[in-house]
A protein has these predicted regions:
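Long, charge-rich, low-complexity alpha-helical segments
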Residues: 23-74
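Short, Lys/Arg-enriched N-terminal segment that forms or immediately precedes the first helix
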Residues: 1-16
Length: 74
């Protein structure tokens, strides 16, 4: 995952696309809003490549996979 970096001096250490100040969170929010990869690149971040967006998804998957999730019934 060399396309995603964490630097404590950029966005307070939030994961970003390498070589940019674009956070993984920003990309995930746009995907959640229903935008396609192509729309994100065309309308928001023309310097990104499709592989950068895929890397954001892979990063999120890796985080969730590493969590110890415990469901609690209310």
């Amino acid at each position: 995952m060399d396309r995603i970096v964490v630097n404590s001096h950029i966005h307070f250490g939030k994961p970003c696309v390498a070589g940019t100040r674009i956070t993984v969170q920003s990309i995930l929010e746009l995907l959640n809003d229903g935008l396609s990869f192509e729309e994100i690149i065309r309308d928001y971040y023309p310097d990104l490549q499709i592989e950068d967006i895929r890397a954001c998804l892979q990063y999120a998957i890796a985080l969730v996979a590493a969590e110890d999730i415990r469901l609690v019934s209310i």
